[in-house]
Amino acid sequence: MARFRFYGQLNDFLPWQFRHCRFMHALRGPASVKDAIEALGVPHPEVDVIVVNGQPADFTYRVQDGDEVAVYPPFHRVDITGLRRVGTDPPQPVRFVLDIHLRKLCALLRLAGFDALLLTDDAEVAELSATELRVALTRDVGLLKRRIIRHGYWIRQTNPELQFVEVLQRFDLADRMDPFVRCMECNTLLVPVDVDVVAERLPPGTRECFSQFHRCPGCDRVYWQGSHYERLVRLLEDARRKVRLKPDPTDAPCRKQALSGPAYIRPASSVGSAFRRTFRRARSRSRTNRW
């Protein structure tokens, strides 16, 4: 038997009786801490730091009877410089690969200017995430447990616009948006095009009302600031505002509280201070479309 404690958003993967508390877990023979963590439901890309008996450990550590294991997600505001991490930050700028069930989220990421690919096959999602160091986004926990995935995130929300806010917050992207530069259908960067080149493809009256047009080299769609443009601008601004107003769930354990509607997540206690306490000894010891 070993005692486990999961912090922050990692509790989202656990049965309710194991959330935000220490609990005993029976070991089924020799197992790495990675296997033990995933057996409890937490996919390895969501884990950033593991502490065993007060000392940092990596995924290969073999769990022993009597071990005290603390598992942490990535933190945005806790300085862990010099401490061993099992997670790594994705290369910048962040690029994504999404499974087919997140089609609407993928379109919103492209709208905001982010490189986001959409694939139908889970094996292809995992392979592309591994070879191109893209962040795999999915609602399928099992997909994130595939060994080859290094960077991945399980989308908690079910509403596409809230999913978009969630991704902006998790990867600190609210101020890195570059809207209306990618094709929302195929992800290709758009290029300016002269109106005379696409005039025959435009609805009547469009040429007289708009002066700037862009074409997608990938699928040949044409874009201009049509009737939906202002609504999309508001959508992006609302998302940025929500990120700034919403508490960062990576900085505190979260608990879900039932409301009249979908559950929401709110901070429960300071995981930052718990994280620093855990490491105090360890650090001293080791140093044709329209927008």
Task: Briefly describe each language-model feature range.
Residues 242-291:
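Intrinsic disorder/low-complexity segments
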Residues 1-95:
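Ubiquitin-like/PB1-type beta-grasp interaction modules and other compact soluble beta-rich domains
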Residues 183-186, 216-219:
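Short cysteine-rich clusters marking metal-coordination/redox-active sites
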Residues 60, 200-213:
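Short linker/helix segments within small regulatory modules
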Residues 188-195, 224:
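Short functional micro-motifs and their immediate structural scaffolds
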Residues 170-179, 205-210:
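Short, flexible, mixed-charge glycine/proline-rich loop motifs
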Residues 89-119:
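Short, charged N-terminal beta->alpha structural module
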Residues 120-145:
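BRCT (BRCA1 C-terminal) domain core and associated BRCT-interaction motifs
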